[in-house]
Regions:
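Membrane-interface extramembranous regions
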Residues: 1-128
Length: 128
């Protein structure tokens, strides 16, 4: 089960990174503050996806937790940009990739949180 969660979490994190890099390449790079943040999100997302795949089981809990928090922060930033605006940028629900991003990031937060909880609970089990 943990392998499935690990692969799903890495895949969702990589998808989130790919979306941000694609949007950055499609013109978001020209936006003050938002542009560099999209690039940073894409690069960090790739690194976290790779970390989820190669991290030993004993360290998986912290890596999954950090990735879940990163994804939740990204999702929160999207909600802000859809409602009040973020750094002077207002996003529309009808804009390219907004809905897929909402789905990917929401699923990512759920999967990564479950992975972190199961990984931490596995670490705390007494050995027989």
């Amino acid at each position: 089960m943990r392998l499935v969660l690990r692969l799903a979490g890495a895949g969702l994190t990589a998808a989130m990174a790919a979306i941000h890099l694609s949007l950055w390449d499609d013109g978001y790079r020209d936006l003050d503050t938002i542009g560099p943040l999209f690039l940073l999100n894409g690069v960090v997302g790739i690194l976290l996806a790779l970390a989820l795949l190669v991290t030993p089981v004993r360290l998986l809990g912290p890596v999954a937790a950090v990735t879940a928090l990163f994804t939740a922060g990204t999702l929160g930033a999207l909600f802000l940009s859809l409602t009040t605006g973020l750094f002077g940028f207002d996003e529309s629900l009808d804009a390219d990739l907004v809905r897929p991003t909402l789905y990917v990031e929401t699923a990512g937060v759920l999967v990564l949180t479950i992975l972190a909880v199961t990984a931490f609970s596995h670490r705390r089990r007494p050995r027989r």
